[in-house]
Each structure stands twice: as C-alpha cells, then as structure tokens.
Amino acid sequence: NIQSIARYSKKFSNEDLHEIIISKNLEIEAWFRKQWIKYPAPFYSSIDLRNSGYKIAPVDTNLFPAGFNNLDVSMESLYISAVQHTLEKQSAELTKILIVTENHTRNKFYSKSLTTLKSFIEKAGFEVQSCMLGDECNTEAINKDLVLNNSILSYKKFIPDIVLLNNDLSAGVPDILKNTKQLILPDLHMGWTNRSKTCLLYTSPSPRDDPL
C-alpha cells in the first residue's frame, strides 16, 4: 500500500486533527471505495481545497481538469493504474483514446497538462491522440480533421474506441459529438451548456431549509 504524506502551505491550528486523518487513512480510503461503488466517480475531476488551519473544505470541482503536470511524479504508477482500471471497466477491448481538448492548446501551461495526461494514458497501454474541437483558424467552426461517418467519429483516420472530453463545452455541444456512437467521457450533459453556477446558486436549498 503506497501512502503519500500530505504537505500543506498553511499550518494546522490543531495538529491532532492532522494526525487523526493520517492514522485513519485506510478507513477513509475504504469509505471512498464503498461510495464509488454506489455512485461511480467521473473519469477524472479536480477539486480545489481551502485550508483554514482547523479544517479543510472543497470549494470548487472541475469535471474537465487541467494541471496534470502538477501531480506528484513519485505517484505516477498510481495514476497509470487508475487509468487502466477505469478504462478496462468500460470494455476490455478498448485500445484507442481520442482526447478532445480546449481550443487554447497554445497556452503553455495547458499544453504541459495535456502532454502529461497523454503520457499517463499511453503508459497504461492505450494508443492516444488529441485534437482541438474548434478549427485552428476559426475556433467557432469544427476542426476539419474531425469527421463523422455513419455515426463513427474519426480524427485524421484515427478511429477511437472512447472520446475523452477535456473541453467544457461552454460554447455548446456540436452535432458531431451529439451524433457519435462512441462512448464519450465525461458525458456530454456534464458540459457548461447544461450547467450554470447561477442556476446552481438559485436552485440549491437554503441552509434554513436543511434539517438540523
């Protein structure tokens, strides 16, 4: 069992809490595994945590994450194993993965993240390609190298078994993805076209409505 030592930029005001979390690591992991059986986790996500010194709380979740290049390299074997396990659960026949990226791949930080993500997938034993959803010269148009033929999506003659979205679809879901037979992860309905922070704010129950 490989365990990592958490390092926080802000010191805990209660060191006992930190020690309890570390000592209960196996029980915490077991609880998460049980929850993931009941509520399957997305292929990937990132969570922003806020450390106030006496508690740590999640403040934001991203279903189309970047920042893979910031992960601890000493834990790479765990990332690769997670990729293998998650994809093999979909089908043992999977071999080819297409990552549909954001249109700002010239952003050096995003490019580093994408390179790292591709590396994890390749080391997990899969063939992987990536492409922007938008055309390089006109991002409002669909990438001309993405072709849909008989509901099968291909990119430069590369036919993926799974399409991995790393694009939040804030500009909408294009027909080329709506009509694709291949499995798309995360689901198209998870894009920002169907979600809104404003809607979440106004549809969430008031704290006063929650039972004590």
Regions found by a protein language model. Give the residues of each.
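Redox-cofactor binding/interface segments in oxidoreductases and associated redox assembly factors
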Residues: L164-L165
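Single conserved hydrophobic/aromatic residue that forms the stacking wall/gate
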Residues: Y202-L212
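Short secondary-structure boundary/capping segments
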Residues: S113-T116, N179-K181, L200
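A short, gly/pro- and small-residue-rich
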Residues: S170-N194
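Glycine-rich, charge-decorated loop segments at or immediately adjacent to ligand/cofactor-binding or catalytic sites
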Residues: R195-L201
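ATP-dependent carboxylate activation and anion-phosphoryl transfer catalytic cores
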Residues: N1-D145, P160-D161, G172
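Short amphipathic alpha-helix with an adjacent loop that forms part of the alpha/beta core around
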Residues: K144-F158
